[in-house]
UniProtKB/Swiss-Prot annotation:
This is Secreted effector protein SptP. Residues 162-293 form the Bacterial Rho-GAP domain. InterPro entries: Globular_prot_asu/bsu (IPR011070), Prot-tyrosine_phosphatase-like (IPR029021), Protein-Tyr_Phosphatase (IPR050348), PTP_cat (IPR000242), SptP_N (IPR015203), SptP_N_sf (IPR044899), Tyr_Pase_AS (IPR016130), Tyr_Pase_cat (IPR003595). The tyrosine phosphatase activity is inhibited by sodium vanadate. GO terms for cellular component: extracellular space; host cell cytoplasm. GO terms for molecular function: GTPase activator activity; protein tyrosine phosphatase activity. It comes from Salmonella typhimurium (strain LT2 / SGSC1412 / ATCC 700720). Residues 35-139 are annotated as: Chaperone-binding.
Amino acid sequence: MLKYEERKLNNLTLSSFSKVGVSNDARLYIAKENTDKAYVAPEKFSSKVLTWLGKMPLFKNTEVVQKHTENIRVQDQKILQTFLHALTEKYGETAVNDALLMSRINMNKPLTQRLAVQITECVKAADEGFINLIKSKDNVGVRNAALVIKGGDTKVAEKNNDVGAESKQPLLDIALKGLKRTLPQLEQMDGNSLRENFQEMASGNGPLRSLMTNLQNLNKIPEAKQLNDYVTTLTNIQVGVARFSQWGTCGGEVERWVDKASTHELTQAVKKIHVIAKELKNVTAELEKIEAGAPMPQTMSGPTLGLARFAVSSIPINQQTQVKLSDGMPVPVNTLTFDGKPVALAGSYPKNTPDALEAHMKMLLEKECSCLVVLTSEDQMQAKQLPPYFRGSYTFGEVHTNSQKVSSASQGEAIDQYNMQLSCGEKRYTIPVLHVKNWPDHQPLPSTDQLEYLADRVKNSNQNGAPGRSSSDKHLPMIHCLGGVGRTGTMAAALVLKDNPHSNLEQVRADFRDSRNNRMLEDASQFVQLKAMQAQLLMTTAS
C-alpha cells in the first residue's frame, strides 16, 4: 500500500510539468496548496535569492542558506523521481531505463520545463524503437551510441558502456519503485493466476517483466556490484523449465511450460518465486538506504532463501564463495580457501526443515564431497534438538538416505564413522561420515593429539587427494559444527597444517575470514591448540 504522500505525487501526470507562461529555464518544484493537493510550480523569488546568496562566500555558510541548500536538494530529488514516475506510467519502464542509460542529459541539474522536454524526447525515441535500432546487428557502427538532445533534435553520438554519474541515482530510484510495486504482486500470485495471467505478467508493465527490467538497472552501475551479484544469484535459480531471469518474457519456452505444466508443477514454481521475491526485499532495503544517503554496500551476505539455521546478521555468508546447486539454488555453505586453493566446504548445522535438509543432501551428492565431518557433540545435539540426519534412513524431498555405522574409532570412542548412501533420481553416491562426539562449543578438543588424529582421518577419507588440491568446490570435505565458524574453522585449518606444517596460521585465519565471514577461528583457545599442533608437526618433520 502506497503512503498517502506517495499517492498524491503519483497522481501528477506529464501534463503537470508543462506550465504555460513560465520560463522554460525556471526551476520547478512540487508545491502543496493544502493537505489534499500537490502541484508543480516554478521556484519562488525568495528561493532564488537564497540560492544566489549560497554562491557568495560571505553567506554560503550561514545557517539559513545551508538549510535552504539542503531543502533544494531534497526538492530536486523528489520532483525528478515524480517526473520519471509519470514518464514510466505513459511509456513503460523499458523505454525510460533505455533513455536514461543512453542519454547524456545531466540528471543532476534542477528540473526545468526545457529539461523535462529533453528527457521526454529521449524516452519517446526509446519507446519508438530507436534504442533497439542502435543495438541491432545492422547498425554495428553505432551500437555504442548515445542519444544527445541539441536544439530539439535527436542525434547519435559515440559513447562507452559506462553509465554516467548523473544517471545512476535515477536508475536506482526506478529500480526501487519497481521492486516496491512488483514484489507484493508476485507474493500474492498462485498457480491458477500464474497460468491464467502469464502473458500479461510477462509483458508491458506486468510484474514479471517489470521486475526483470528493474533488476537489470543494477547491472548498469559498477558501484552496485554487490547488489547485482545478489540479484544474479537469485535470477539464476531454476524455476520450472528455465532460470528465473527468463520469466520476464512471453512467447518462449516459459510460457509454453506454464501452459502445459501440472497443478503440482505450477505450485512448486510459485513456491520458488515467492521465496525469491521475499529474498529480493533485501535489495529493496539496501536501495532505500542508498536513497536516504547511504553509500553502496561494499559487502553483502549471500541469499539464504530460508535455508540457513542462523540469520546472516549472526553468521554471514560470503556470496562470492557461496556454494550453489546445479539448479542455481544457493545453499548456506562457503568454500574455504587458503592461498587461493579450496580447502573444504563449511557451513552451519543444517536447519531442521524439509527444504533445508534436502538442499544439504543434494549438495553432498552433487559436489561428491570426499567426506562429511560433523563436529557437533552428542550433548549439544540433544540440547539443541538437532536432527541426526547423518545416521539412519530418511527421505528429504527428492533425496533418499541410508546410513550405516562402520565403527567407533579410537581416541576413547569419541569418533563414530558411518557410510551414508545418497540417491536422487538415477544419481547415487556413498559418502563417509565422521561424527566427533566430544568437542565442546567454543573450546578445544581434549587433546592436540586428537585434533591431529582427526585431521588424518579426514585426509584418509578423501579419495580425491589432500584438501587444497581440488580446483573447484567438488570433492572437498564438508565440515560443520553448530555455527560453522569456530570448530569448523579449526578443523579446516588442521587440514592445511597436515598438508603443509609451515603454513602461516594467521594467514590461514585471514583467508578463511575472507572466504566465509569475520567470525572464522574466533575462539582463542582453539587457535592456541592449532599452534600446538603445528609445533608438534614441525618437531616431527625436523626429526
